[in-house]
């Protein structure tokens, strides 16, 4: 069984494996059954914006939160753009445009990481496969609960992410730059189904999407919805040196006239 105790080489191998291309000895593809007209009508396609990665270039706020509603429960992450600006911007655009809807937690290594970020839609995976962003400097450590982009080498970040289960500080020197952290629901993250570990093949998820996972990994946990939480405005305070207006004293109750 692979564990983090095997050292730096294993950690590098595990995370590089996360985005390696399909092996040459891939099994032959089977032709899926054609969906009925009714089923086709009931399954809308992805947002047009998701099919055009170059259009998703919004700058993320300095700090923001995103809520993940999953089949294991809900958790909230808080992102700090100054930690990794390019990673924060990419994550912000993915969440805002519904990229993670129905995406699976396809790699769960207890004590190490839980990984996700391949779309349930093969058409979306195809266009994002080469939408790489440059690396950010690593300014935060890979502590438990930190949110990080997976990579297959320098400047290869696209859409795959992982949450650290353990203290994986050894990943800091490999270029894995945390840009956020789980602030609510880490217990939920810890309950994500680990039974399949690294069995789901990422090349088949990429090419077949959710159909492959449904057919082969029925217990896999998925993201139902990820959304940016609205910013909470701070309570208003009076200007410095200005005292708040005094509340008027209540008037004494009128006494009944004496007879």
Map each language-model feature to its residues.
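Cyclophilin-like peptidyl-prolyl cis-trans isomerases
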Residues: 19-259
């Amino acid at each position: 069984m692979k564990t983090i105790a095997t050292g730096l080489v294993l950690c590098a191998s595990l995370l590089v494996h996360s985005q390696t291309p399909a092996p040459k000895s891939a099994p032959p593809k089977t032709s899926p059954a054609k969906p009925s007209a009714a089923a086709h009508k009931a399954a809308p396609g992805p947002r047009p914006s998701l099919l055009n990665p170059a259009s998703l270039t919004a700058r993320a706020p300095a700090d923001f939160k995103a809520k993940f509603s999953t089949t294991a429960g809900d958790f909230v992450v808080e992102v700090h753009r100054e930690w990794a600006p390019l990673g924060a911007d990419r994550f912000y655009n993915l969440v805002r445009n519904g990229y993670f809807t129905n995406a699976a937690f396809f790699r769960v290594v207890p004590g190490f990481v839980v990984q996700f970020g391949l779309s349930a839609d093969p058409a979306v995976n195809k266009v994002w496969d080469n939408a790489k962003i440059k690396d950010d400097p690593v300014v935060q450590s890979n502590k438990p609960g930190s949110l990080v982009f997976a990579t297959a080498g320098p400047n290869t970040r696209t859409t795959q992410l992982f949450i650290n289960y353990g203290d994986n500080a050894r990943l800091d020197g490999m270029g894995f730059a945390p840009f956020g952290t789980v602030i609510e629901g880490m217990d939920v993250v810890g309950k994500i189904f680990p039974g399949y570990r690294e069995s789901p093949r990422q090349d088949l998820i990429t090419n077949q999407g959710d159909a492959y996972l449904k057919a082969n990994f029925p217990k896999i946990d998925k993201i139902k919805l990820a959304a940016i939480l609205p910013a909470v405005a701070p309570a208003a305070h009076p200007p410095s040196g200005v005292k708040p207006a005094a509340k008027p004293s209540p008037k004494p109750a009128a006494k009944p006239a004496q007879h």
